[in-house]
């Protein structure tokens, strides 16, 4: 899928443990590979065991360190258990990438309680719980850390033509969560920032395109972005270069949306 080298922009993350959610496809898979290529010890998490193991094997074949751990982002017990398992295998998590998310793909008045709960739990409650668990450990050990939340440009703009009402709502909340956690944990040297992607190639995007058709021709550059084009921003936010950057939201959308 990618025409870009791995990683697109490099930095040294040797010795740091990076916990990435939603790594079985799309952006999360790319994030895990990029962080490992830069020396981080990666905890790759998700629901699909076969894909997690395949990703870990791929990273190890390239000389990286990766431990696959199954996680259910709708279950607080699963989240906490996965973090404990990650610590037992690799040590304290210093980098957290809250990437896991699901779409609603349904009009608000037609959404079932089950879908509503799943979207809220996966997109907001799960990242909240995981962020707090990681931060608590870092604070107890007086260690600095980096948390990067993945929101969406849907947090800022929504089209009535596409059923994304609840998805947009949860991603808006992720933006505010980023800002709030950044303020609360600044004194502890835990930087919390957010990336708000536009249309990038992923399973979620493929699903949307199958429902609404090709949207790229309405974009100024008439393209869907490649996950590799997010490398430099991700690495900036987890590296010493962003030491003074916290509570910031960076839109990466190729000029696709309004301002």
List where the protein language model places each region:
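Short, small/polar-rich loop/turn modules that mediate ligand/substrate recognition or access, typified
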Residues: 186-191, 245-247
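Active-site helix of classical SDR
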Residues: 131, 170, 178
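Residue(s) in the substrate-gating loop at a strand-loop-helix junction
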Residues: 152
């Amino acid at each position: 899928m990618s025409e870009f080298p791995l990683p697109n922009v490099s930095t040294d993350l040797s010795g740091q443990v990076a916990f990435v959610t939603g790594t079985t496809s799309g952006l999360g898979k790319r994030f895990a590979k990029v962080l490992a290529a830069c020396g981080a010890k990666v905890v790759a998490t998700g629901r699909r065991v076969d894909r997690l193991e395949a990703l870990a094997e791929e990273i190890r074949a390239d000389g990286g360190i990766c431990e696959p751990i199954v996680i259910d982002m709708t279950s607080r017990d699963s989240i906490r258990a996965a973090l404990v398992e990650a610590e037992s295998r690799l040590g304290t998590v210093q980098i957290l990438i809250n990437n896991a998310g699901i779409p609603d793909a349904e009009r608000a008045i037609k959404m079932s309680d089950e879908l509503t709960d799943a979207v809220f739990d996966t997109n907001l409650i799960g990242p909240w719980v995981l962020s707090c668990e990681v931060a608590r450990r870092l604070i107890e050990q007086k260690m600095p850390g980096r948390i990067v939340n993945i929101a969406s440009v849907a947090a800022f703009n929504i089209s009535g033509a596409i059923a994304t009402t609840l998805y947009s709502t949860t991603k808006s909340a992720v933006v505010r969560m980023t800002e709030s956690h950044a303020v609360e944990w600044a004194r502890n040297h835990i930087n919390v920032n957010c990336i708000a992607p536009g249309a990038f190639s992923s399973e979620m995007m493929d699903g949307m395109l199958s429902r609404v058709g090709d949207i790229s021709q309405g974009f100024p550059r008439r393209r869907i972005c490649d996950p590799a084009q997010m490398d430099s921003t991700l690495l900036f936010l987890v590296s010493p270069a962003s030491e003074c950057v916290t509570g910031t939201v960076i839109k990466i959308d190729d000029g696709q949306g309004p301002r």
